[in-house]
Amino acid sequence: MSKDDSIKKTVTIGLSTTIFFVLSCFASIPVGFNVSIETSAAFLAFIAVAFGPSVGFYVGLIGHIIKDFFLFGNVSWNWVLCSALIGFIYGLPYKIIDLKYQVFTKKKIVYFWLYQVACNFIIWGFFAPQSDLLIYGQPPKLVYLQSFLIVISNILAYSVVGIKLMTIYSCHYTKQATLMKINNS
């Protein structure tokens, strides 16, 4: 990785973490049982797909730490790790989807929608509740209800906000890439 790339990634992580935190605090809709529909979940998916798994990991990690600290006064480390992990996993197909140089087609939208559904079920539907049961000994019914609501709310947030963000970003950059190719010919 060149020096310019590492600087760009660092700046992207810093700015995206700030946006993640602001969205977590001010753009979430409570649905009950300490669960909210968070636009920050859709933003994390967008950032990870646009910039790759390492950026997704750090935005999920740092953003969730700051959010927990400011909103709750303490950090739930198992959930922070789940946010970091899902940010990383969301970013794995970033070269396949390639928002910057290829159109975000319906096929890619469906592919990533199914992919993020599977990721949400694995991370928030399995790992997060299991870690709550093992670490905190919380009541299983409450833990699984929360995890089910989180999975559904993340899927809804991505379906409404994430797809729009990715489509707008892709349209903007693919037009620029096409213009650059035309100008260089």
Swiss-Prot record:
Signal peptide extent: none
Bilayer topology: Multi-pass membrane protein
UniProt subcellular location: Cell membrane
Keyword Isomerase: no
Major site of localization recorded for this protein: membrane
Gene Ontology CC terms, in alphabetical order: plasma membrane
Domain of life, per lineage: Bacteria
NADP as UniProt keyword: no
Pfam families tied to this protein: ECF-ribofla_trS
TM stretches of this protein: 13-33, 42-62, 69-89, 109-129, 148-168
Keyword list, A-Z: Cell membrane, Membrane, Transmembrane, Transmembrane helix
NCBIfam families, A to Z: PRK13661.1 (NF010182)
Annotated family: Belongs to the UPF0397 family.
Protein name: UPF0397 protein AYWB_013
Originating species: Aster yellows witches'-broom phytoplasma (strain AYWB)
